[in-house]
Amino acid sequence: MKTLSAKPAEVQHDWYVVDASGKTLGRLATEIARRLRGKHKTSYTPHVDTGDYIVVINAEQVQVTGKKSLDKKYYRHTGFPGGIRETNFEKLIAHKPEAVLEKAVKGMLPKGPLGYAMIKKMKVYAGTEHPHAAQQPQVLDI
């Protein structure tokens, strides 16, 4: 039996909606990264984007365990010499709740053109409303 190799034109991408309220950040991010990559499908091919679209709602209600809300650091650089900036989980979730989940999932995906295409298929929203009702996303319980 020959090995199946998916072709980009033949891949079917489904839409799923995930409710992040009360979920642990890391456990949620690993499952989302797995689905974006397409590893849950039998037609998974490493060099082809076989993953699904994921819509995450209630990103502001994602949780971390222990003292990570104060200890977990996020870094960014302004582009100027000495321009490294640091913030913790608590401040970032208050200011930009979508960025926490996006950074967690992005770090779990491959780096390069294929990984960039995968991260674009994840849509994160702080509240319960999202503009993707036309795609009829299925509820995914994680």
Swiss-Prot record:
What Gene3D superfamilies does the entry give?
Ribosomal protein L13
Coiled-coil spans in chain: none
User: Which GO cellular component terms, listed alphabetically, does the Swiss-Prot or TrEMBL entry include?
Assistant: cytosolic large ribosomal subunit
The answer to keyword ATP-binding applying to this record is no
Which keywords does UniProt give here? Ribonucleoprotein, Ribosomal protein
Q: Name one Pfam family in it.
A: Ribosomal_L13
Instruction: Name any one GO molecular function.
Output: mRNA binding
Which processes are annotated in GO (biological process)? Answer: negative regulation of translation; translation
> Could you give the subunit structure recorded for this chain?
Part of the 50S ribosomal subunit.
Q: Which family does it belong to?
A: Belongs to the universal ribosomal protein uL13 family.
The UniProt function text for this chain reads: This protein is one of the early assembly proteins of the 50S ribosomal subunit, although it is not seen to bind rRNA by itself. It is important during the early stages of 50S assembly.
Q: What is this protein called?
A: Large ribosomal subunit protein uL13
- Gene name, per UniProt, is rplM
